[in-house]
């Protein structure tokens, strides 16, 4: 059985989020929480919140044992991009893309 949690429209680039997700994928849930606690990235705070939600979903909705859970899948997809312009000299303008992410964490029980 698996439980899933999704955070949508997170104002963070998916590329930056994937760096942290790669650290916890396949790890035991308790080990993943320890890794996220000491990871000096802004994405670690958001991923920690999503992982807590996935564990709570597993325990409350599917009656799974929290100590036997592991992160089976963790991925970040591209959300909508906000387009902004930075004015430059002589009437020029350069575009700025403020990217967002949809973060998904799936936990399963070890056999």
Curated annotation (Swiss-Prot):
Q: Which UniProt keywords apply?
A: Ribonucleoprotein, Ribosomal protein, RNA-binding, rRNA-binding
- A GO term, aspect molecular function: structural constituent of ribosome
Q: Name one GO cellular component term.
A: cytosolic large ribosomal subunit
Is Ribonucleoprotein among the key words of this record?
yes
* InterPro entries for this protein: Ribosomal_uL22 (IPR001063), Ribosomal_uL22_bac/chlpt-type (IPR005727), Ribosomal_uL22_bac/org-type (IPR047867), Ribosomal_uL22_CS (IPR018260), Ribosomal_uL22_sf (IPR036394)
Q: Which CDD domains match?
A: Ribosomal_L22
The Gene Ontology biological process annotation of the record reads: translation
Which residues form each disulfide bond in the chain? none
| Highest taxon of source | Bacteria
Which Pfam family name is an example for this entry? Ribosomal_L22
- Similarity comment: Belongs to the universal ribosomal protein uL22 family.
Report the function annotation for this chain. Answer: This protein binds specifically to 23S rRNA; its binding is stimulated by other ribosomal proteins, e.g. L4, L17, and L20. It is important during the early stages of 50S assembly. It makes multiple contacts with different domains of the 23S rRNA in the assembled 50S subunit and ribosome. The globular domain of the protein is located near the polypeptide exit tunnel on the outside of the subunit, while an extended beta-hairpin is found that lines the wall of the exit tunnel in the center of the 70S ribosome.
PANTHER family xrefs: CHLOROPLAST 50S RIBOSOMAL PROTEIN L22-RELATED (PTHR13501), LARGE RIBOSOMAL SUBUNIT PROTEIN UL22M (PTHR13501:SF8)
On assembly, the entry states: Part of the 50S ribosomal subunit.
- Specify the protein name: Large ribosomal subunit protein uL22
């Amino acid at each position: 059985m698996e439980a899933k949690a999704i955070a949508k429209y997170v104002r963070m680039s998916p590329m930056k989020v994937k760096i942290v997700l790669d650290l916890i994928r396949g790890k035991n849930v308790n080990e993943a929480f320890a890794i996220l606690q000491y990871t000096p990235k802004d994405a670690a705070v958001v991923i920690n919140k999503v992982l807590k939600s996935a564990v709570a979903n597993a325990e409350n909705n599917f009656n799974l044992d929290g100590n036997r859970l592991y992160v089976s899948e963790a991925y970040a997809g591209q959300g909508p991009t906000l387009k902004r312009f930075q004015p430059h000299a002589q009437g020029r303008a350069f575009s700025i893309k403020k990217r967002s992410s949809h973060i998904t964490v799936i936990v399963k029980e070890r056999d």
